[in-house]
Amino acid sequence: MSIHIKQSTMVRPAEETPNKSLWLSKIDMILRTPYSHTGAVLIYKQPDNNEDNIQPSSSMYFDANILIEALSKALVPYYPMAGRLKINGDRYEIDCNGEGALFVEAESSHVLEDFGDFRPNDELHRVMVPTCDYSKGISSFPLLMVQLTRFRCGGVSIGFAQHHHVCDRMSHFEFNNSWARIAKGLLPALEPVHDRYLHLCPRNPPQIKYTHSQFEPFVPSLPKELLDGKTSKSQTLFKLSREQINTLKQKLDWSNTTTRLSTYEVVAGHVWRSVSKARGLSDHEEIKLIMPVDGRSRINNPSLPKGYCGNVVFLAVCTATVGDLACNPLTDTAGKVQEALKGLDDDYLRSAIDHTESKPDLPVPYMGSPEKTLYPNVLVNSWGRIPYQAMDFGWGNPTFFGISNIFYDGQCFLIPSQNGDGSMTLAINLFSSHLSLFKKHFYDF
């Protein structure tokens, strides 16, 4: 698909901002490699009659000038996003130098319908999400990049490339909400808090009370012959209606559990089982379920301030053999998920912070496999609490929100319906040879 870049603007904060270095916690640094951004897209389909949605000060649907001006104002309280990474000794910092965020305005001769259901893929990412050149060094590229793309049908997309060292998805969408509110002439809903050292520094002396295997590489050695013919990967979407979710939950044996299981716990357990069955591994092989968890509500001694802007993502991990996942009921599997999530309390997370800081060479947790490596584990990332409906810049709510590209086999995202009908969509990357079996098991209930 063709795309034409009309202009690229480095948007600086509208006012003078603090010129300082911002300390990053190990939690900030280990979720992604420093030479990478995370992509997401918002889709807005222009209404047939949009008189009530158009900004009164603009005759253009999604006026770039309004968005750029609002972005410049939003970068004042969120000034680290206008900075650059730098290295200080053995760790990264954010140089809050106000160099700016990249805003790209583009247009395409295609229509939004050409992208079908907006499943994540390389082409969607290429067309809708901005990129940068990493070859010039760690301080050369912006930490936030945004692209407004107009399509022939009148609809638009806003693609984000966000650097994970700056903040996690929740903080990023709080920033987007502030940007959207400013574009409508409103004040930001939250005042961001950027001091990571004050709130997430390690204790002295460290108090490591648990074994934190979730911060170690997750790739075990598997027989090479299992890889034969499995070099092509596919990204796709699988939808679960409210009725299907209720049917799945009705299959649970509630007599064997003393607590109620949440929808996420049930669906995540179901995905874990379905992927395990689809891969055709031996019964004795272990398969882990890895779940990124927002620690904001779990850290309470002391609690994080409202508006904390940084990474508060920790990993909950369940382990089972392929045979156990196939034979045991879903109630047991979902119970394992619940148990792993409950274990991430304040005491455990503070211990995890101390553990990460005590390991100077701690690697990025391996959340999937590179090309030509068979990876037995599954990562299920929930986007259920992301306020995507707050992304109204003055022209109405998005009609779609999702990840733009999933790079690793076994990585998936659970995204709730945008229309509030109780359904959810699973975006997943698997080897192409596993997809048909996964679909069979995923809908077999």
UniProtKB/Swiss-Prot annotation:
What is the superkingdom listed in this entry's lineage?
Answer: Eukaryota
Protein name (Swiss-Prot/TrEMBL):
Anthranilate N-benzoyltransferase protein 3
Known EC number: 2.3.1.144
Could you tell me which species this protein originates from? Dianthus caryophyllus
Q: Which PANTHER family match?
A: SHIKIMATE O-HYDROXYCINNAMOYLTRANSFERASE, TRICHOTHECENE 3-O-ACETYLTRANSFERASE
Metabolic or biological pathway: Phytoalexin biosynthesis; methoxydianthramide B biosynthesis
A Pfam family: Transferase
Catalytic residues as annotated in Swiss-Prot or TrEMBL: 164 (proton acceptor), 392 (proton acceptor)
Catalytic activity field: anthranilate + benzoyl-CoA = N-benzoylanthranilate + CoA
| GO BP | flavonoid biosynthetic process
Q: Which Gene3D superfamilies match?
A: Chloramphenicol acetyltransferase-like domain (3.30.559.10)
| Role according to the record | Catalyzes the formation of N-benzoylanthranilate, in the course of methoxydianthramide B, a phytoalexin. Phytoalexins are produced in response to infection by parasites, and are essential for the expression of disease resistance.
Q: Which InterPro entries match?
A: CAT-like_dom_sf (IPR023213), Plant_Fungal_Acyltransferase (IPR050317)
**Swiss-Prot/TrEMBL keywords:** Acyltransferase, Flavonoid biosynthesis, Transferase
Q: Does the keyword Cell cycle apply?
A: no
Indicate the family of this protein. Belongs to the plant acyltransferase family.
Q: Where do transmembrane segments lie in this chain?
A: none
Q: State if DNA damage is listed as a keyword.
A: no
Which GO molecular function annotations are given, in alphabetical order? anthranilate N-benzoyltransferase activity
* Description of post-translational modifications: N-terminus is blocked.
The conditions that induce or repress this protein are given as:
By fungal elicitors. Elicitation triggers a rapid, transient induction, reaching maximal abundances within about 0.5 hours and returning to basal levels within 4 hours.
